[in-house]
Amino acid sequence: MANNIEIKDLLDAGVHFGHLTRKWNPNMAPYIYMERNGIHVINLYKTAAKIEEANEALRKIVASGKKVLFVATKKQAKDVVAEKATSVKMPYITERWPGGMLTNFVTIRKAVKKMSSIDKMKKDGTFETLSKREKLQIERLREKLEKNLGSIADMSRLPGALFIVDTMREHIAVKEAQKLNIPIFAMVDTNSDPREVDYVIPANDDASKSIEKILSYVTEAINEGLSGRTSDNKENKEVETAE
């Protein structure tokens, strides 16, 4: 199994840099190593242990056929989250969180279907029969839907888990997941409340290098879970054939 986490790699990526001590959340105390120049330093041995713990759970979730929805709308996280989530074929939200994304999933699915129906209109020629004004309106709607929901177009049911970068910023996503008992995995910085999260990864959630490093471990574990599922399906098919 992969994911041998080197403390030096975490250090080089700046995963240990927390926030100013005056901005801290006291509930993060167990994960703080020390204070240096008015900044809290995260205990990377605890980070490594928490990554392993989270990865073990993530492998099981994806091996059972469920999706992990990645959520990160802050500037320094958007691109890396989109890239990493896409690499393991998982849905992600990097634009504004659509209110009711989880708690009103049926409505969100309708919006995604609207996107598909516009694409169908373009394929079957219906689009060409519309007036110039109607075409423009539909194109604008399609662009808006694509921007906000394009990355979750293949998510036909609620996710098995959420992976969040910065729980303070994504507090609405956190609340919706809690309401539906969907497990929350998150990078939690020293200014955030770890009590809201099922699988806490104490880490610098402001630097893109730190975010990329944590996500590389997480997506590697997801890949392993997917590979395990593929080989299980293959074995099942072989057994069925033999019978």
Question: Model-predicted segments: where are they?
Answer:
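Residue-level signature of catalytic and energy-coupling elements of molecular machines
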Residues: 14, 70, 162, 214
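Short beta-strand elements at the ligand-binding edges of bilobed clamshell
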Residues: 46, 197-208
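Nucleotide-binding motor/catalytic cores of P-loop/tubulin-like NTPases across gene-expression machines
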Residues: 168-201
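Active-site rim loops that border cofactor/substrate pockets in soluble metabolic enzymes
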Residues: 119-161
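Short hydrophobic alpha-helical runs that function as membrane-insertion/retention elements
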Residues: 68-69, 91-94, 183-187, 222
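N-terminal cationic and glycine-rich segments that engage phosphates or anionic surfaces
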Residues: 1-67, 73-74, 78-121, 132-135, ...
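Conserved nucleotide-binding/hydrolysis micro-motifs of P-loop NTPases
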Residues: 74-77, 97-102, 168-170, 190-194, ...
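A charged, well-structured terminal subsegment
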Residues: 212-237
